[in-house]
Amino acid sequence: MSRRSGSLPPRISIPTVVGSVRLVQEEELLKTPGMKLENCRVVLVRPAGAANVGAVARAMKNMGLHQLVLVQPRFRNRFWVRAMAVHAGDVVARMRVVDNLADAVADAGLVVGTTSRAGLYRTPLGSARELAPRLVAAAQSNVVALVFGPEDHGLSNEDIKWCHQLLTIPASPEYPSLNLAQAAMVVCYELFLAAQAQPQSELGPRWAPARDVEFLFQRLRDAFLRIGYLHPQNPDHILFAFRRILGRAGLEERDVKILLGLARQIEWYGDGGWRILQEKQREAGVTAAPEKR
């Protein structure tokens, strides 16, 4: 019958081979025991909205993350946290509140900040999708802290210094800014997919906790200032480069001890140890290399 008579056209059966393959792959992916996300921690720095925090908690629960830490939240009433979390009440119940970012990431072997702003100290290592596999692998033997900044202006440079690596979320240049819950959901989703795609394997290296790495950077800062390597008016300019270099490499506890020894030796040399060294060289008959002109 024609469509003019009010009848529907005959249904045409088109095999959705591509869709079927994709669905089967996703089902098999979820059945495969993947890597664990229990060591992944979401850190919200100075969040302004209780509802946003609740939405982040829900996104975390959807994707299998359970550690949530707030740094100096700018709200008191937690009603909307619980309301927006819906069935993620257990995440909210275990949520910690701390006074500073240092306390939130002190035990983390890897601290990853999220940024949408470009700048000298804000060059991301990659997108959330690109970094997710290595973050999941690191989380098998380390606490991995994922740091999100305030809703209004993101992470400050002081916050960024605690981050070993930075990631970004690509978005349309027409409106590239995501709200807090959206950003958290995207990152958690990429971690979830990466975890499911990677079968459980042997544990990787255990990295030094962030508090020890930060202590190292402070010692290096003092040592470099002692020998005039850093500009006294802006010492953190060059030090940020060291943070990025060593952050990309990943430092084990043994590495931190070696670099602390280097910092102590630099301080000793800058405090007059060079004179003792010169005297020993003269006694040993070693001639110092001539200065370059």
Name every feature range the model reports, one short phrase each:
Residues R3, S7-R293:
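Post-transcriptional modification and biogenesis factors for structured RNAs
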